[in-house]
Swiss-Prot record:
Cited InterPro entries: LIM1_prickle (IPR033725), LIM2_prickle (IPR033726), LIM3_prickle (IPR033727), PET_domain (IPR010442), PET_prickle (IPR033723), Pk/Esn/Tes (IPR047120), Znf_LIM (IPR001781)
Biological source species: Drosophila melanogaster
Protein's recorded name: Protein prickle
Tissue specificity field: Expressed in the wing, leg and eye imaginal disks. Expressed within the photoreceptors of the eye.
Compartment(s) where it occurs, according to its Swiss-Prot or TrEMBL record: Cell membrane
Keywords assigned: Cell membrane, Developmental protein, LIM domain, Membrane, Metal-binding, Repeat, Zinc
Amino acid sequence: MSSLSTGGGAGGSSGGPGGADAAAAPAAGQATVTATGNMEPAMVPRTANLLACKQWWRVCFLYGDQQKYYRQLYSKAAAQRLADANQEPDNARDREYDTVDCDLIAGQLDAVEDADDGIDLGDHSSTPKGGATTAGRPLFPHSSSPRRSKKLLRSLRAHVRGEKLPKNDTTTANESSEVTQRNARVTVLDDPFLFGIDADHLGDLVVRGKRYSTLDATENMARFYAEQEATAQVLEIIEQEEESPEQEAPKPALPPKQKQQRPVPPLPPPPANRVTQDQGTQPAAPQVPLQPLTAGDLQFLNLSLRQRSLPRSMKPFKDAHDISFTFNELDTSAEPEVATGAAQQESNEPISRTPLTQISYLQKIPTLPRHFSPSGQGLATPPALGSGGMGLPSSSSASALYAAQAAAGILPTSPLPLQRHQQYLPPHHQQHPGAGMGPGPGSGAAAGPPLGPQYSPGCSANPKYSNAQLPPPPHHHHQLSPALSTPSPPSLLHHPAGGTSSASAHAPFLGGPHMDMQRQSHSDDDSGCALEEYTWVPPGLRPDQVRLYFSQIPDDKVPYVNSPGEQYRVRQLLHQLPPHDNEVRYCHSLTDEERKELRLFSTQRKRDALGRGNVRQLMSARPCDGCDDLISTGDIAVFATRLGPNASWHPACFACSVCRELLVDLIYFHRDGRMYCGRHHAETLKPRCSACDEIILADECTEAEGRAWHMNHFACHECDKQLGGQRYIMREGKPYCLHCFDAMFAEYCDYCGEAIGVDQGQMSHDGQHWHATDECFSCNTCRCSLLGRAFLPRRGAIYCSIACSKGEPPTPSDSSGTGMYTTPTPPTQRVRPHPQAPLPARIPSSHASSSPPMSPQQQQQHQATFNQAMYQMQSQQMEAAGGLVDQSKSYAASDSDAGVVKDLEHGGHMGGGDLTDFSGGRASSTSQNLSPLNSPGDFQPHFLPKPMELQRDGVYNFNEMSSNLDAAWSAKPTNSYHLQRQLLENPHTASMPELAGKLVAPPAHMQHLSQLHAVSSHQFQQHEYADILHPPPPPPGEIPELPTPNLSVASTALPPELMGSPTHSAGDRSLNTPMSTQSASHAPPHPVSILSGASSSSPMSGEPAKKKGVRFEGIPDTLPRSRSYSGNGAGTSGGGERERDRDKDKEGGGRHGHGHSSRRRRRRKSSSSSSHHRSGSGHRSHSTTRADTYAPAQPLSSSYQGPPSVLQAANLVHESPSRQQREREREREREESEESDVCSTCSSSSSSSEDYMMMYQLPQRRHYGGVRVSYVPNDALAYDRKRKPSELGGDKDKNCIIS
């Protein structure tokens, strides 16, 4: 009885041994009743009861509003003490009974308004009538529920009136409870927790020894209160207090700070037993008639508590926590349990400092009662775990400890708040552990050696939280149970040792002393103000120590209120302490046998391995068992007694040995000298199902992928087909049957469009997939199988060679797939005698083969060879062009041209034999692009690589450039690139890929170009070829100026792609325009401006009319990789650019057999040439800039800039003179427009032309038969574009830099 409440316990003891015993018996009965009442599902929502009973944290961790419990406890304690003073012998029972009834009534009223009241009253009334039947009613009927303060008062009064009679019954009930308690004591955890007490289980604790008759209870209460007017007064006071709080309570979702509650002036100490009147008969002589609680007491107990806890706290019964607390019995043996219950009750009441956090956690976790406070966890849980060897005598204590874990899903609430609330009780209400608990046989003996004063509120480190005013009596209920080697939190301490009777173990909520004991250092409140900042703090620390502790933990894991650390803690509680590892009710589809096994499994684990870290400040340095580093003196260390008395860790090192995550709330399990979180410890003992996450208790299970499943859980994640013994596929840790996997995740073949089955071979590359068959995984052009061969991916398609990627029929070199660039054939070979005649042989471009680009040395070698060939070709072209050229202006290459391109300004040059420039006609420009690779038959518009604009300003190495070019130019299925093809075919867009992309309206000259393109490509090609093949030779002096080696270098130096692909403008045009196609197939035997064209049309550039500008390393990226047609004048002049590009393409086509339009960028050095380049004709004439000016060794950084209109011009030059003339006119128009144009597209961050000059010097261009047949690299074009505005401004050196 004494254990029920300090007052009650004291009363029972004072009553005399017999009286004590008698009181104990009724107390036990009443305690049982109380527990039942509190836990009764009718009183509380079933879910709440279940939660309360089964939560891991139920006992030790404060589930609900601790404040409720505190209020109840305090008010009851005060009332009981007063009553005890009046009735000593019976006071114990009365107090106990009252406490139980009051708690039940208050909680029930709060939780279930009318229904709860009826139930509680009925139960209580039955018990009082029966005498023995009077089961304890709510221990603390505080007006904790201000909303129902009147109801509570009525019920309490009724209860008081009927109280005396039911004392005997209460005793009986208590005895019954003791039996239950004994069972609980056997296990470390509370019975509800260990055995997963549901509403039914609640009955186990509550119903045992308790029979409620609502009417009886009500009548008894009424009688009791009639007799106990003092109690009525107290209730009235409480009611008054309640009324104001009622208004307050609903407002805060979270309990107000308990500090507010403290201010209540201590009441004159009433008999300690007053609260415990319910506990049993009132054998104790009424020491003092029930004294009405003083306003201060009431305020302290109710208002402060109410404010802290809020209405929730007022509704203890709603909280499962409240229910769980009712398990404590009043007997001295139960006294520790009672203390535990009180602690729980307190814990249920949110700590004033951490109420918000607690509530937030509870709210976050649906299973947890709103008022559950994670902050309270620390208190209850650690002690229970304290000693591995000692089994917690009371199940409640064990459950409290493990409850936190069991409640992992449920946020454990620290018992600390309970202690704190106890401390808040007025001193007289705060019962000394000794006073509240007469050293009854149950209380002291069961409790075992009293805990050190540090655990008692009075002894708490923080005096303001401690009940220092009260002499710290031996904390029997706080004493660690044998199971707890370390001092358990007050809640745990409240649990009696194993020796205590089971009844005492589940004593009703304890009076103040017990509460105080629980609240002492373990309460979060003990941490002081610091507690308000955190949702949980280690128990027993001062605020400064709390901060020191958290300072050693990562900020993102510090459980500040409403912080990521708080969320982390909640997640970890659920993860590390899975409820289904300990509670049957959280499991699914367990057989009865498995249920039993789970309970045993959970109980054994908790008894043998569960512990809670103890945080202390070191007095001397010691090594950390986690990191082996030294923990300095004065630092905070965490001790785990189960792993040894001296085992200590840094706070940040106190982590699970498996998941390495901080052990939440310091709860750990140990096995073989290692610490585990609850989850991983369970997995060391039993396999865990990967599907349901539950421990596999069955004899059979399925193991796959190194994991385990229940036999019926290893099934297809989609169709639930069991996969035991079946084929399956794991994806993201989930098994799928083959059918579902194919339906959900199968890839589709890019060739045939069919799904690639699990059983089928699959080839994948860069997000593309093919059946691993010769048919599907084959060259997109020639359809030769690529299985086991290197392949060239371009524009979403795969090719066996560069030629195929350009849409040309594969040549032995191209289709060989050797990946080595064949030695470029002499330009003459590549030049076809007849435009229609197929190109005899292309100089294989570095791109020709599907193999990777050559190394720089190889490139250089090829470049040298190609330069020679190109030089020859260009010479021939120049010679042929020379005849055609009416005028040849050699423009001093501007520095910026850097020897890239020197354009012959005159359109006449273009008009010359080189008018064959395909840009002169759409076909002509196309023809250049087509060049040998792009023979009309071979040409596939969809394979035309889209002009790629290199955005990099830095020098490109050829391999990289080639890869980039390939990517940009990779041929793509016609369907994919149909639009592009159309754009390319569009004379405007063809000449200027950028423009094509932009669909820029071509200037008049562009229109002319389009018209030219409209002209049959064959005509233009023929003319061009004729011109190209027979262009008037340019002045001999000019030929040398056009160093073909540079072109060859460009082709060689260029990445194979650059070399292989024509400048995209040229390439696009040539491919796009039928002419170019034809010309490609019928590349003119004469190399059209071999230099520029060679680079562009060299076999290396033999790629389909790709307009790739090559930038050399030495050249700063003055010319942006971006295609800027305006800079070339072609870009700005749209059509002009296109024409230039066509010219370039033609040049490339002529030089390269028109197949290769990969253009090395030749930077025009002469501003005039650049200006001319800007003008379509100028570009054409100047596009012949010698590529050889580029050092072969220097990697050409290719920037795809607008198709060099110069090349187009050159191509036009190759065309018939009439066409050349038209080309010249167009070019002039372009020039005019370009001159007016601003370098809009040359987004080059490149340096001025001087930079180019410094890096490269282009020999003066020669007029090729009056036709400027020269390939203008994109750089040159871009540079020209840049320079053009400057030229327009009269500043030849001015670079139009767009960055």
